[in-house]
Amino acid sequence: MLRIEHLTKVYDDGTRALSDLSFEVTPGEFLVIIGLSGSGKSTLLRCINRLIDPTSGRIYFQGQDVTAAAGPELRAIRRKIGMIFQQFNLVRRALVLTNVLSGRLGYLPPAWAVVNYFPGEVRRQAIADLERVGIAQKAYARADALSGGQQQRVAIARALMQDPQLILADEPVASLDPATSHSVLRYIEELNKKDGITVVCSLHFLSLVRRYGTRIIALRAGQIVFDGRAGEVDEERFRAIYGEDAVEVEIR
């Protein structure tokens, strides 16, 4: 489904965020990207859907060269890839329903978006997606009136509006408490297991990784230092990923 070939990203200030990354993601996987802050996790996810452009290398999604795509072709690829951000990326002053409806904009004529017109079936889908994440009762509340966990569930519903085949989740629980973290990850896990949506998710805590991921890729200084199953990350590998002085923190 997703193939990364020799991906490198060097920022304008000379920072090398990714160095010659190559791997594949098969349909239905729940792949978790781990590593220290600054290891390249967010850069990798943002390169995959071209929020930022890689310096070199190739990204293929369902056989299409994402790195070469532009205009309508790139928009068509992005429609199939839902994105969930650490800071939710909601329009905070807008209604919850309006935020969720925005996930469907890629399928609608541009003129409809200008006048904020969404057909009845699209609105019904938005309410159904909010029901799925247990927050339909907040549809007509402003996004900034919601808790962090509720806002992240709105973001999941927005991603669902795209009918995605791949979801990229960039540290979706980094700003949430443990109980809320599990709640949000269970919704993402349900999309993976019940809907067959492939997930690539960056996380910090190995206890969460072991609970939800089917595969781990660990980054260190922009390079892959581990690619395997969660249960294979023993103390030696943990220290190779996070450093000799690192201590594993368990999230229950």
Residue map of PLM features:
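Conserved catalytic motifs of ABC-family nucleotide-binding domains
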Residues: D163
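Conserved ABC ATPase "signature" region
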Residues: Q64-D65, L108-Q137
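Helix-to-loop junction immediately C-terminal to a conserved catalytic motif
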Residues: N49
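Conserved ABC transporter NBD signature motif
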Residues: G57-D65, I77
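Conserved ABC ATPase signature
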Residues: R142-L146, Q150
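Helix N-cap at the start of a conserved alpha-helix in ABC-type nucleotide-binding domains
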Residues: P178-T180
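Catalytic Walker B motif of ABC-type/P-loop ATPase nucleotide-binding domains
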Residues: I167-D170
